[in-house]
Amino acid sequence: MRFSKSLILITLSALVISFAEANDPSPLQDFCVAIGDLKNGVFVNGKFCKDPKQAKAEDFFYSGLNQAGTTNNKVKSNVTTVNVDQIPGLNTLGISLVRIDYAPYGQNPPHTHPRATEILVLVEGTLYVGFVSSNQDNNRLFAKVLNPGDVFVFPIGMIHFQVNIGKTPAVAFAGLSSQNAGVITIADTVFGSTPPINPDILAQAFQLDVNVVKDLEAKFKN
C-alpha cells in the first residue's frame, strides 16, 4: 500500500511538472538568435543559436506588415505570420505576431493554436469573432462584434474564428504567446488529412451521410 501511494504521488508530481512546462521555456540568456548553421551553434527551443557576439539588429527586425495580404482565395482572408522563422531573434522569447486581412465577408475559419494564447486588435472594418470552450465547459460560444480599436482574447488551445461582417475590407493584428504558435485549421485537418480519415468514422462522428463526407474530403484533399 505504501508503494502504491508513493507511485501515485510520483505520477501526480510528474503530471503537474509537465503541465507547468507546457509553454515556451524561459530563456536563460539575453537572447538566442536562431541560426541554420550547426557550426558553433547551441540547440535551444528547436533552433540552433547564433554566437551572441555575432548577433545584429537585423536578427530582431522585420519589414512588411504595412502591406495587405492577398485575399483572393476560398476563405477570402490572408494571415501574414511574423514568428521565429521571420525574426530569428524571437527564439526563446515566447512571442510572435500576425497580420490578418479579410475581404468583405471573408473569414479566418475555425482553427486552434496548440501552443499559444492569442490577443487580437481590430484596426479596420467590422469583425464577428469568437471561441468555443472545452467539453467540460459544455462547449460554450464566447463571441463579440468588434469595431476598430476593440480587442479580443482567444485562450490557448480553444477553437476560434473571425468573420468580416462588413462590406469593406478589414485588418487586424494579433499577438501570440509563443515564438511559433502552430495552427490547426479544423476543416482542413479533419477532411483534408493525409492519408484521409475513413469516411465511415467521420460520418458517424459528424452524423452525416457517408457520401457527404466523401464529397468534403474531395474538396479539402491536399
UniProtKB/Swiss-Prot annotation:
The keyword Glycoprotein applies. Residues 63-214 form the Cupin type-1 domain. One of its GO terms (molecular function) is manganese ion binding. This is Germin-like protein subfamily 1 member 14. GO terms for cellular component: apoplast. Keywords: Apoplast, Disulfide bond, Glycoprotein, Manganese, Metal-binding, Secreted, Signal. It holds the Pfam family Cupin_1. It is found in: Secreted, Extracellular space, Apoplast. PROSITE patterns: GERMIN.
